[in-house]
From Swiss-Prot:
Record keywords, A-Z: Early protein, Virion
Chief place of localization: virion
Record-given protein name: Putative RNA-ligase
Inducing or repressing factors: Expressed in the early phase of the viral replicative cycle.
Protein species of origin: African swine fever virus (strain Badajoz 1971 Vero-adapted) (Ba71V)
Subcellular localization, as worded in the UniProt entry: Virion
Annotated family: Belongs to the asfivirus M448R family.
Length: 448
C-alpha cells in the first residue's frame, strides 16, 4: 500500500477506498483504514463473517480476494468509524463526520452518515463566529442519537438497521432492562409518528425494524428519548428528526429546509432560539441543576423545566469548519453523563440500573444530586444503607467467613491493611463507602 497523504473529505475517502479495493485484497484496504484512524485518533469497528477454509465466498465479495492464499479467515461486511477523543479546533470536516459513520466494506460506499461530532468549547473563535451571526441556536434535548439505514445482510437478508455513534447496528442491543433498541424505537414511533413500520422478533436475527415507506437510498438520523435509556422520568419520552442524507449524492437535508425527506409524522421539535448574547446563554443554563430538582420536587413533568444546554449550528460550515457544531452542555447534562450514561464497566443490561444507582449512592458528591433527580429510586438507597451497615459490622469483627459477604470483607480488610491504616470505625466507614467496591457489592445485593 502506498504512503500518500490521507484524504480530507468524505468523497475523497470513499474514492480512495474504492481505488485501493481494485488493486488489493480487502484485508490490505482495512489495514490502510486502520492507519487512517490511528493518525486522526479515530476508532474502527468491523462487522465480520467467518469463512471456513475452502468455502466459497458469496457473489458480493470481490473476486480478487479468493485467489491463491490471500483469502482471509474473516470477511468484513461493514465498518463503523467513531471518535476516540473530543473534537479539536483545527480538525478537518471529514474527521468530525466520523461520529458513527458506517461504510459498506464490499463497495466502500456510505450506509449511515450521522451529524458531525460537535466541538465542545466556547473558544474565542467560536465567540467571534457567534457575534457575527454564523450560528443558529437550538436547545439540546437529552436523548440518544441513532441513524436508520437499509442493509441487505448476506446472512439474514434485508432490514433497516440502527447505527449509533459507536455501533454499526444496535437494533438487538439492550441498555437497561430487556427491551432492545429496535423495540424502543418501534414503541416511540407507534406513539409519535404515522409511519408504516413493522417490528420482527426472530430467534436468529433478533429484533428488526422494517419500514414500508422509507427510501433505501437515504439514511435518517433521529433522536430518541425513552425512559429505558434516559431514566429521568419527569422529562417525557419523545422522538424527533435531526437530518436525512442522500447516500448517492451525500447531500444532507434538515427538517426545517425545503427538500427534506424524513420519517412520516416525525417533526424536528427543536425550535430555533433568538440570538441572545453568548454570555447570557451560558448564564441561563448555570442554574439548570437547581431548576430541574425544584421541578421534580414539585411534581412538574414537562421538558421546559430541563435545560441541558445549547447547540450552535453553523450557517457557513465552509468558514467555521470543525467548529460548525458547538455543544454547550449545562451542569445538568454534565451530571447525567457522568452519573448515568458513561459506560465504565462491562455490566449486563439486567444489572445496569442497579449498578448505576449503587455507584451514585457510594459517591458522596453525587448521592444527594442523584436521588433529587431520580426520587423513584429512594427504596434502593434504603437497601444499600442496610447492606453497608452489615458490611461495616462484618469488617469490624473481621468476619471473613461470612456466608455471602466473606469475599467483600476480606477485600476491604486487605486494602485497609495494605495502606497501613488503623482499623477503627471511621476508617472502615470511609473504605466501605468507596465506589470502587460497587462491583463487589453488586455480587451480594440479591441478599438484601
Amino acid at each position: 500500500m502506498s504512503n500518500e497523504s490521507f484524504p480530507e473529505t468524505l468523497e475523497n475517502l470513499l474514492s480512495t477506498l474504492q481505488t485501493k479495493q481494485q488493486n488489493a485484497i480487502q484485508s490490505e484496504v482495512i489495514e490502510w483504514l486502520h492507519s487512517f484512524c490511528e493518525t486522526f485518533h479515530l476508532k474502527i469497528h468491523c462487522h465480520k463473517q467467518f469463512i471456513p477454509s475452502g468455502e466459497k465466498k458469496r457473489a458480493k465479495i470481490p473476486a480478487q480476494e479468493i485467489q491463491g492464499n490471500t483469502q482471509p479467515s474473516h470477511h468484513v461486511h461493514r465498518v463503523v468509524l467513531s471518535r476516540a477523543q473530543p473534537v479539536k479546533a483545527q480538525e478537518s470536516l471529514l474527521t468530525t463526520m466520523c461520529n458513527g459513520l458506517v461504510l459498506d466494506a464490499n463497495t466502500w460506499t456510505c450506509l449511515a452518515i450521522p451529524p458531525p461530532a460537535p466541538f465542545q468549547q466556547a473558544t474565542r473563535q467560536v465567540q467571534h463566529f457567534y457575534r457575527n451571526n454564523f450560528y443558529e441556536v437550538v436547545p439540546i434535548q437529552d436523548g440518544t442519537l441513532l441513524t436508520i439505514y437499509y442493509w441487505d445482510d448476506p446472512e439474514h437478508g434485508p432490514s433497516w438497521c440502527l447505527a449509533s455513534t459507536h455501533g454499526y447496528d444496535v437494533s438487538n442491543y439492550c441498555w437497561i432492562g430487556d427491551k432492545t433498541f429496535a423495540e424502543l424505537v418501534y414503541e416511540l414511533l407507534q406513539q409519535h409518528s404515522t409511519c408504516d413500520v413493522t417490528l420482527e422478533k426472530n430467534k436468529t436475527r433478533g429484533t428488526r425494524l422494517f419500514f414500508n415507506n422509507l427510501n433505501p437510498d437515504y439514511c435518517y438520523t433521529i433522536g430518541i428519548r425513552h425512559h429505558n435509556l434516559q431514566p429521568l422520568i419527569y422529562d417525557p419520552q419523545n422522538i424527533w428528526a435531526i437530518q436525512s442524507t442522500n447516500l448517492k449524492t451525500l447531500k444532507t437535508v434538515y427538517p426545517e429546509y425545503y427538500g427534506y425527506i424524513g420519517i412520516p409524522g416525525i417533526q424536528s421539535q427543536v425550535p430555533e432560539l433568538p440570538q441572545y448574547d453568548l454570555p447570557y446563554l451560558i448564564r441561563s443554563y448555570k442554574t439548570a441543576m437547581n431548576q430541574a430538582k425544584n421541578a421534580i420536587k414539585n411534581g412538574k413533568k414537562d421538558k421546559e423545566y430541563f435545560n441541558y444546554g445549547y447547540l450552535l449550528i453553523s450557517r457557513a460550515p465552509a468558514i467555521t469548519k470543525s467548529t460548525s457544531n458547538v455543544l454547550l452542555k449545562s451542569p445538568l447534562l454534565v451530571f447525567l453523563q457522568k452519573s448515568v450514561y458513561q459506560k465504565k464497566h462491562n455490566i449486563s443490561n439486567s444489572q445496569r440500573l442497579e449498578f448505576i444507582i449503587l455507584q451514585n449512592y457510594l459517591m458522596q458528591h453525587f448521592r444527594d444530586h442523584f436521588i433529587a433527580l431520580f426520587p423513584q429510586y429512594i427504596s434502593y438507597y434504603t437497601k444499600y444503607q442496610n447492606m453497608l451497615n452489615m458490611i461495616i459490622h462484618s469488617i469490624a469483627t473481621k468476619d471473613k467467613d461470612h456466608p455471602f459477604a466473606g469475599a467483600v470483607v476480606k477485600k476491604v480488610l486487605e486494602d485497609i491493611e495494605n495502606a497501613e491504616n488503623i482499623i477503627d470505625h471511621t476508617t472502615i466507614q470511609n473504605y466501605a463507602h468507596q465506589s470502587k467496591y460497587a462491583m463487589l457489592y453488586l455480587s451480594i445485593i440479591s441478599h438484601f
